[in-house]
Amino acid sequence: MKLLTVAFSLLLLGQVHASPLVLDKRSSCQLGDVWDLNAADAACSASCAIQHGDKHGGHCDKNKVCVCN
């Protein structure tokens, strides 16, 4: 029973830890596209530079998900 509880806890922790990354990839493109400023790609590029010091560019794909180059 304890093994099942530990396994379930690790699975749940893994899902919680993985979720913010997807949300963050979408949020930079969506927030950059507010008020028709067309700054989504710039926000994505800045997000890539902050998160990955070695990646200095990025763009938003057709699903508004940030793709770091």
Swiss-Prot record:
Residues 19-26 form a propeptide. GO terms for biological process: defense response to bacterium; humoral immune response. It is found in: Secreted; Target cell membrane. Keywords: Antibiotic, Antimicrobial, Cleavage on pair of basic residues, Defensin, Disulfide bond, Immunity, Innate immunity, Lipid-binding, Membrane, Secreted, Signal, Target cell membrane, Target membrane. Shows antibacterial activity against numerous Gram-positive bacteria. It selectively inhibits peptidoglycan biosynthesis through complex formation with the cell wall precursor lipid II (1:1 molar ratio) thus inhibiting cell wall synthesis. Belongs to the invertebrate defensin family. This is Fungal defensin oryzeasin. It comes from Aspergillus oryzae (strain ATCC 42149 / RIB 40) (Yellow koji mold). The lineage of its organism: Eukaryota, Fungi, Dikarya, Ascomycota, Pezizomycotina.
